[in-house]
UniProtKB/Swiss-Prot annotation:
Lineage: Bacteria, Pseudomonadati, Myxococcota, Myxococcia, Myxococcales
Listed EC numbers: 1.14.19.77
Outcome reported for the amino acid change (mutating H104A): Impaired carotenoid synthesis caused by loss of plasmanylethanolamine desaturase activity
Membrane-topology descriptor: Multi-pass membrane protein
Site positions (Essential for plasmanylethanolamine desaturase activity): H78, H103, H104, H113
Gene: carF
Job description of the protein: Plasmanylethanolamine desaturase involved in plasmalogen biogenesis in the membrane, required for light-induced carotenogenesis. Plasmalogens are glycerophospholipids with a hydrocarbon chain linked by a vinyl ether bond at the glycerol sn-1 position, and are involved in antioxidative and signaling mechanisms, most precisely in sensing photooxidative stress through singlet oxygen. Participates in the light-dependent inactivation of the antisigma factor CarR. Mediates signaling by singlet oxygen, generated via photoexcited protoporphyrin IX.
Membrane spanning stretches: 29-45, 59-75, 124-138, 143-159
Annotated Pfam families: Lipid_desat
Subcellular location: Cell inner membrane
Protein source organism: Myxococcus xanthus
Name of this chain's protein: Plasmanylethanolamine desaturase
Alphabetical keyword list: Cell inner membrane, Cell membrane, Membrane, Oxidoreductase, Transmembrane, Transmembrane helix
Family of this protein: Belongs to the fatty acid desaturase CarF family.
Length: 281
């Protein structure tokens, strides 16, 4: 099925209804998440500052690898939010999935969000990792690197939606525009690829460096086919409507990658149990 035919089948939710889903309770939760996140990151920096193992190269490598990891994490979370779940789910639907649905029907809405609404969700999902990083022992270079890497990764994860917001602004600040042009943060033209119906590619939105490698290995399409095969769930049904979602699955069905076939065989073998031998004489 041609892409144009699939685009005609797309049916999205109402932008105003989605925007109204941002409740005072969700905002209070996001404020608490931001305060908690900043407190944990400051505590982690304090611990790292006092260790003799935190060398310059160790910290720089942790920051760079953390940036790449954050880009991948942003893509994975973005893919999960775009592809699975529903706005009607308890708690998660309004707090986490709703913003993904709103963004596809009103992509400029994010430019009207303040700091809390823009960054609160990412602070919230980063809290468990921040606690783990803070609890790691600082008894050697390896542990210090792990703590630094995790701390850097979640810092960039926290900044992801801010970079994402800037990529949708018509006139971002001058320094931001420069960083976008040299592709040190997410550039608007690069992100535009994702905002082409049916919104099924280029999910990484911290900087976008991981988009091409993940596209080359068919990472997200492979994951979708395996999940659909194993569970029967239809990817993007809540985002673009059941008809368009089914059309996408049918269009992709004829080009199944060998790795998907192999994974299906392994899963089948793992789930099929042999019948116990009869003990009757």
């Amino acid at each position: 099925m041609k892409t144009q035919e699939i685009e005609k089948k797309v049916r999205q939710q109402d932008a105003q209804v989605l925007a109204q889903g941002y409740s005072p309770a969700i905002r209070a939760m996001e404020i608490a998440a931001i305060v908690s996140f900043v407190s944990l990151e400051v505590a982690l920096v304090y611990r790292l500052w006092g260790t003799p193992y935190a060398g310059t190269w160790l910290l720089l490598s942790a920051v760079l690898l953390g940036y790449l990891a954050a880009d991948f994490v942003s893509g994975f979370v973005h893919w999960m939010g775009d592809t699975w779940g529903s706005t009607e789910m308890p708690v998660l639907g309004k707090a986490l999935i709703r913003p993904f649905r709103e963004h596809h029907v009103d992509e400029k809405a994010i430019t009207r969000h303040d700091f809390v609404e823009t960054n609160g969700n990412n602070c919230l999902i980063s809290l468990p990792v921040a606690i783990i990083a803070l609890c790691l022992p600082m008894s050697g270079p390896g542990w210090v690197f792990c703590a630094s890497f995790l701390g850097a990764m979640i810092f960039w994860v926290m900044a992801t939606n801010q970079f994402h917001k800037w990529s949708h602004m018509d006139s971002p600040p001058a320094l931001v525009g420069f960083l976008q042009r040299v592709h040190l943060i997410l550039p608007p033209d690069h992100h535009r690829i994702h905002h082409t119906k049916p919104y099924n590619k280029y999910y990484c939105i911290t900087v976008g460096w991981m988009n091409k490698p993940l596209t080359m290995v068919h990472f997200f399409p492979t994951a979708e086919r395996l999940i659909t095969w194993a569970t029967g769930l239809l990817p993007r049904q809540d985002d673009i409507g059941a008809e368009a979602a089914r059309a996408l699955v049918v269009a992709a069905g004829g080009s199944e990658a060998p790795v998907v076939q192999a994974a299906k065989e392994l899963l089948t073998q793992a789930t099929v149990q042999e019948k116990p031998a009869s003990t009757r004489p």
